[in-house]
Amino acid sequence: MSTIENFDAHTPMMQQYLKLKAQHPEILLFYRMGDFYELFYDDAKRASQLLDISLTKRGASAGEPIPMAGIPYHAVENYLAKLVNQGESVAICEQIGDPATSKGPVERKVVRIVTPGTISDEALLQERQDNLLAAIWQDSKGFGYATLDISSGRFRLSEPADRETMAAELQRTNPAELLYAEDFAEMSLIEGRRGLRRRPLWEFEIDTARQQLNLQFGTRDLVGFGVENAPRGLCAAGCLLQYAKDTQRTTLPHIRSITMERQQDSIIMDAATRRNLEITQNLAGGAENTLTSVLDCTVTPMGSRMLKRWLHMPVRDTRVLLERQQTIGALQDFTAELQPVLRQVGDLERILARLALRTARPRDLARMRHAFQQLPELRAQLENVDSAPVQALREKMGEFAELRDLLERAIIDTPPVLVRDGGVIATGYNEELDEWRALADGATDYLERLEVRERERTGLDTLKVGFNAVHGYYIQISRGQSHLAPINYMRRQTLKNAERYIIPELKEYEDKVLTSKGKALALEKQLYEELFDLLLPHLEALQQSASALAELDVLVNLAERAYTLNYTCPTFIDKPGIRITEGRHPVVEQVLNEPFIANPLNLSPQRRMLIITGPNMGGKSTYMRQTALIALMAYIGSYVPAQKVEIGPIDRIFTRVGAADDLASGRSTFMVEMTETANILHNATEYSLVLMDEIGRGTSTYDGLSLAWACAENLANKIKALTLFATHYFELTQLPEKMEGVANVHLDALEHGDTIAFMHSVQDGAASKSYGLAVAALAGVPKEVIKRARQKLRELESISPNAAATQVDGTQMSLLSVPEETSPAVEALENLDPDSLTPRQALEWIYRLKSLV
């Protein structure tokens, strides 16, 4: 904001604006003026750049022209969406006074603050993604982290112990807005994130947090929520809740509990693992060819959001998983009937949040009614499903016949967007409203009846009833008959050829008609608000119903996917290990134009590490990733792409796959690789699944080999994690001879003439050839380069004392060998008989051969 030195020099309207702006200095202020929201001074300049709207000037105040930009009120949602997507927050200032009775500027106040993490408007949200507000706190013992989805009321907290875990949480939750304390030490952890909001220290005070949360939940303490002994998480949660209340300017009745997320309850995946497994986002940042793109055929937005939460937080409780498996199995014969009905339920979860915030629009209530209308059919279909968990969901979703009847009576079939447009409440719902509407709509009929009646009563054939904007309703009699006007006719206007009169009945009717539209609209708004009061006492049951419907959508979807994609139900075992028969990569098999080659896998305490060798393009990375994805799918309760799967307990999944420079942080490919490797070696346990792909690249051969060897030893002997270790260092294939629990497998390739066929099938034992030059030739590397590479390869093999180990079988020849031309010097030597040469001839041959080389 430009410095305003002399406040009194401004006009009263600008003084009002400046007072309101001073309360919200860091965010944009939309100031309502008639049919527009106006922005002034620096706000106007900023908005014109962000929204690409015209920057103009408005008169002058304090002797200076005022920079101004404006947007029409009816298009405000579109502009808010643009600003929120850019991480901006906006204070919405409305006229709350009556211009007709106001002395000076109309009274205005900020009625809500729209921020990226607290939006609930349908137009501003991505319907199939959670939109989270988060707060982060740090002290000497670790981190506190809280998230709130204001569009559903889901409130969570956690206490990540270290920086890596905190980074993984930030990546998993991906908040739209993040609150942090002004003295937050680990700024590098959050720098570059969208929607950062610096908050004063006192907002994170623990006693204030407990008080805020108890007040919100109507409790004396937080023991019942299991968060009493999580002080760091509570500090974050307290700040977050206060911020949500401040921005919404209303109570938040849909936030009725808080849940502690504990590491031991779910499989932990760090940021690199989530990225490498391409769960909801591919490596390029898009949504194509991700696990979600294959698994998510849910028919409601709230079901889609729940499935993504499951995928990012696989549960370790086998009781929950077995229940989900049983439900999926029971639902497989009912998916075709259930999905079309579920599709009609829509996004009930977010509609309920807007109801709680009292911002639900008429079409929200119409959609809620439509959702209620699906419940009887859903309940009837589910009655036939022989499954206790399904019947529990059926009961939880309820029926809400009374609320359905209420909304069917109250709201018209296709209501307008806004209640202020009128015509929302159905005819017959309220007698007084019907009367006001009849007055507004039926004025012409009444006037015609009055004219006929008065003509008959007075006998005056020139009498007629009319209306004009200046004098309102009137009875007009020609000047020739005006002396016969009844005594109760009061003169209103004299014309050249007629007199106009008013009677008490017509005056009363005039007052009614002129105010009927305004009264009808005011009463309609009142009745609409009363609908909220009738619905909100049922909010808790409605939220449970929405949750049950979302879960049913996810489970029906997983049942459909299992049947359509030929998935099998995995079996959980007590000991660490993974045994997969005919396993497939869930994403790759969908994008291939040819049948996917299924592969087995066997990991157990006695066979806990597989050294995977084979050619580039042979399928090593696919094989490793499919193992992790099958494990991940099993631990959300889903069926999996395989013929048979047995899987033991898993606490973490780690991946060190692929490589990329982190230029923004000044870290090279090798540094990124080593950082991820260090995280694995520090945090993996015997219950962890570890994928290590090409460890040791990016440095010298011997450095890389030494690091890869030491890492493999550590994982196999000390940590004893279940490990898939892909490598091009053939020396590592000796590890099974040197330690227990390690085995070699390889991906096969076949040569056929001048071509190479990658079989993509996993075989026991080490690979016999590298095929690096073959792949280079396939990629189109020029023949002369391939030829030179082969010459160099032979030189290196002849020099290396460990050539045999490097080659495994002594051959490193490319399958796509380009026939070499015989050197002229070699040809000359082959034709030479040294025994027949004189000393002079021998000397001449040496010079000749020298010239040929």
From Swiss-Prot:
SUPFAM superfamilies: DNA repair protein MutS, domain I, DNA repair protein MutS, domain II, DNA repair protein MutS, domain III, P-loop containing nucleoside triphosphate hydrolases. Gene3D superfamilies: 1.10.1420.10, 6.10.140.430, DNA repair protein MutS, domain I (3.40.1170.10), MutS, connector domain (3.30.420.110), P-loop containing nucleotide triphosphate hydrolases (3.40.50.300). ATP binds at residues 614-621. GO terms for cellular component: cytosol. GO terms for biological process: mismatch repair. GO terms for molecular function: ATP binding; ATP-dependent DNA damage sensor activity; damaged DNA binding; mismatched DNA binding. InterPro entries: DNA_mismatch_repair_MutS, DNA_mismatch_repair_MutS-lik_N, DNA_mismatch_repair_MutS/MSH, DNA_mismatch_repair_MutS_C, DNA_mismatch_repair_MutS_clamp, DNA_mismatch_repair_MutS_core, DNA_mismatch_repair_MutS_N, DNA_mismatch_repair_MutS_sf. It comes from the Bacteria. PROSITE patterns: DNA_MISMATCH_REPAIR_2. Keywords: ATP-binding, DNA damage, DNA repair, DNA-binding, Nucleotide-binding. This protein is involved in the repair of mismatches in DNA. It is possible that it carries out the mismatch recognition step. This protein has a weak ATPase activity. Belongs to the DNA mismatch repair MutS family. This is DNA mismatch repair protein MutS. It comes from Escherichia coli O127:H6 (strain E2348/69 / EPEC).
